[in-house]
């Protein structure tokens, strides 16, 4: 250890000791009987939507699917943020339409609100075209993502979905947030 560094460290230690001798222990002046606990409510700010936002007008079927996603999220005991991520994911994957087999236009064997694939273990075609089942399956995957509550929506959705277009989910965050705000308590 060089001499200058050692002298500096000794000076800092000496000042810390001297401060304690002259000032005395600070906690000794406080009266623990008078101490009152202070409750502080802290609510994490909702993340701001990333990038340009898209919006579509929903028909009755799509609105029913929004409500089904919210109901499944509540049933799973998850917060509104999980519903926002789920709805944004479904907006990207199917525009909130419960898609069956699309023939030649289909991406492999992807089905339902989340374009889940039976061959990837999401469930049977009948299961993944059931909005409650497909949402619950998506939420099960979301729960396995460490820190999903605090990460950008597109990152959380992509970790579950493993899409060829990982950033595409972000464009639906504002509409998903608005839909959850509109239907969560209805």
Segments (PLM) and residue ranges:
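Extracellularly exposed regions in secreted/surface proteins, prominently low-complexity, repeat-rich
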Residues: 165-186
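Peptidoglycan-targeting cell-wall enzymes and recognition modules
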Residues: 49-56, 94-153, 162
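Short acidic/histidine-centered micro-motifs embedded in hydrophobic/aromatic stretches
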Residues: 88-92, 156-159, 163
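Extracytoplasmic/secreted envelope proteins and their assembly/folding machinery
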Residues: 63-70, 83-87, 113, 132-139, ...
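N-terminal export and membrane-targeting signals
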Residues: 1-16
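Soluble non-cytosolic domains of exported or imported proteins
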Residues: 56-64, 76-84, 125-133, 150-154, ...
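Export/targeting segments at the very N-terminus of extracytoplasmic proteins
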Residues: 46-91, 95, 183
């Amino acid at each position: 250890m060089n001499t200058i560094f050692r002298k500096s460290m000794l000076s800092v230690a000496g000042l810390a000791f001297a401060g304690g001798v002259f000032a005395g222990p600070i906690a000794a002046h406080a009266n623990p009987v008078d101490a009152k606990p202070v409750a502080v409510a802290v609510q994490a700010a909702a993340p701001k939507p990333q990038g340009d936002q898209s919006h579509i007008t929903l028909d009755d079927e799509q609105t029913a699917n929004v409500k089904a996603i919210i109901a499944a999220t509540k049933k799973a005991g998850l917060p509104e943020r999980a519903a926002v991520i789920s709805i944004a994911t479904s907006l990207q994957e199917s525009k909130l339409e419960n898609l069956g087999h699309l023939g030649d236009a289909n991406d492999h064997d992807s089905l339902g609100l989340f374009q889940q694939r039976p061959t990837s273990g999401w469930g049977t075609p009948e299961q993944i075209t059931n909005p409650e089942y497909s949402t619950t399956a998506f939420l099960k995957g979301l729960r396995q993502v460490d820190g999903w509550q605090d990460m950008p929506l597109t990152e959380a959705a992509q970790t579950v979905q493993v899409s060829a277009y990982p950033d595409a989910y972000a464009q639906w965050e504002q509409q998903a947030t608005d839909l959850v705000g509109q239907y969560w308590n209805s």
